[in-house]
Amino acid sequence: MENERCLDLKYAKLSKAGEIIEMLCICLGVFLIPLFLPKLLTIVFGKTSVIASNSQYVVGSVVNTLLIIAGVNAKGWKKVLGIVTLPSISALFGGLVLKASSVYTMYMIPAIWIGNFAIIYLYRYLFVKKNLNYIVTSAIAIITKCAAIYAGFNLLVLVNIVPNGSKVFTSLNIAMGMNQLVTATIGAVIAFGIIITMKSKKVSE
């Protein structure tokens, strides 16, 4: 019975100290990963490697994993707000994830915040509170996040902040569209593995 319901349960019940440590780790992760992971991948694999040249997919996948874990196990909306805002702030200051298009990140920040909040909120509300199946929750949360961010991008195009047909448009169209869908999906898969692992560990104890 436990295995049958493992998709509908939180992965762990932490002590107060454990919750604080978990949230600190997540906050540090979502801030530092966009800032330093691309450079690390370049050093380790080389600038022209497939992994380093597509570092935004690696960064986005890890950040989405942390956002989902926060949605499943975080307590208190004040903590969540920090987790929602830190990745885009890190990307803005580092100028790493979107590279040449990073100057436009500041215009996308509100949409990214809304998207990040949506994925955390929906996992918390649907998966944790309503016990909805993880896969269904993931589909709803990922689509909502991607729609919010891509809508923000299209608004910038509509008001001509991002010129339609330009190189910046092409870059951001991918970064705020397909990139978001791919990285959120990968993040959901990784988070699922973490949740199941922690749940299995809890059951065995």
Role assignments for model-derived ranges:
Residues 1-205:
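Loop-helix junctions at membrane interfaces
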